[in-house]
Curated annotation (Swiss-Prot):
UniProtKB keywords: Ribonucleoprotein, Ribosomal protein, RNA-binding, rRNA-binding
Record-given protein name: Small ribosomal subunit protein uS3
Keyword DNA-binding among UniProt keywords: no
Gene name of the record: rpsC
SUPFAM superfamilies reported in the protein's UniProt record: Prokaryotic type KH domain (KH-domain type II), Ribosomal protein S3 C-terminal domain
Quaternary structure annotation from Swiss-Prot or TrEMBL: Part of the 30S ribosomal subunit. Forms a tight complex with proteins S10 and S14.
Source organism of the structure: Salinispora arenicola (strain CNS-205)
Length: 288
């Protein structure tokens, strides 16, 4: 069976950007570990904030952390108390000065990660998985930016003994198109029957401008009759395989038949003359 590659990593440098932007030589593994710990701390401590993604950018003596959230009030807290607490924990973890930026997600219903979290929360609240999936898809498709969505859940759905995978799709979700802007989100729902994984793909149109799709490619201009070359054709003319002589013979036969039809009904028509005129090729008037 073919497996699906991660849509974000598949399109890095084409339609998506890196979530961690820094360069390191000997400290590469240390920075990677710090990034993992920072994102893990954001996901565990702020479940109700609806965090979509965390971007990390490093300089020599400073770390910049951008938190994209649907509920910035929860992250900021009363008079900025929660933001100060988060900044203090990050400075203790990294040992550098931390610049914390809180960015609000304008349309959370069309964000793949937030949609996956919403479906997982409903599954944890014992809502039917089909109802949760369809409701999330309807809310996402109301946004004109969303061109297509696919929601997939896997696990012991409905408390069944055997785990299975089900998905619903609406619109177009071209996972093999590199220029397609596809957002991907994953979240796990903790239920009494075990964990249920939720995956969401959202297609938001093509992200790479200046490329024409096959449907929009300009067609070749058709030549008019006056634009054709005046050089006389040789051999077979046309796709039907008829020669110039055969065409003239057909015209002569049609003329003979028309004249025969115009004769009075009492006069007999010479059938041999009509047949011989249809089979003999017309003589060309051009000589040597």
């Amino acid at each position: 069976m073919g497996q699906k590659v991660h849509p974000h990593g598949f399109r890095l440098g084409i339609s998506t950007d890196w979530k961690s932007r820094w360069f390191a030589d000997k400290l590469y593994k240390d920075y990677i570990g710090e990034d993992v710990k920072i994102r893990r701390m954001m996901s565990k401590g702020l479940e109700r904030a609806g965090i979509s993604k965390v971007d990390i950018e490093r300089t020599r003596d400073r770390v910049r952390v951008d938190i994209h959230t649907a509920r910035p009030g929860i992250v900021i807290g009363r008079k900025g108390a929660e933001a100060d607490r988060i900044r203090g924990k990050l400075e203790k973890l990294t040992g550098k000065q931390v610049q914390l930026n809180i960015i609000e997600v304008k349309s959370p219903e069309s964000d793949a990660q937030l949609v996956a979290q919403g479906v997982a929360e409903q599954l944890s609240s014992r809502v039917s998985f089909r109802r949760a999936m369809r409701k999330a898809m309807q809310s996402a498709m109301k946004n004109p930016v969303c061109k297509g969505i696919r929601v997939q859940v896997s696990g012991r759905l409905g408390g069944a003994e055997m785990s299975r995978t089900e998905f619903y799709r609406e619109g177009r979700v071209p996972l093999h198109t590199l220029r397609a802007n596809i957002e991907y989100g994953f979240f796990e729902a903790r239920t009494t029957f075990g964990r249920i994984g939720v995956k969401v793909w959202i297609y938001k149109g093509d992200a790479v401008p200046g490329r024409e799709t096959p449907a929009e490619a300009p067609s070749r201009p058709r030549r008019e009759r006056g634009d054709r070359s005046e050089r006389p054709r040789r051999g077979r003319s046309g796709s039907s395989g008829t020669t110039a002589g055969g065409t003239e013979a057909g015209r002569a036969a049609a003329t003979t038949i028309a004249q025969a039809a115009e004769t009075p009904s009492g006069e007999p028509v010479d059938a041999d003359a009509v047949a011989s005129a249809a089979t003999q090729p017309a003589e060309t008037q051009q000589e040597g």
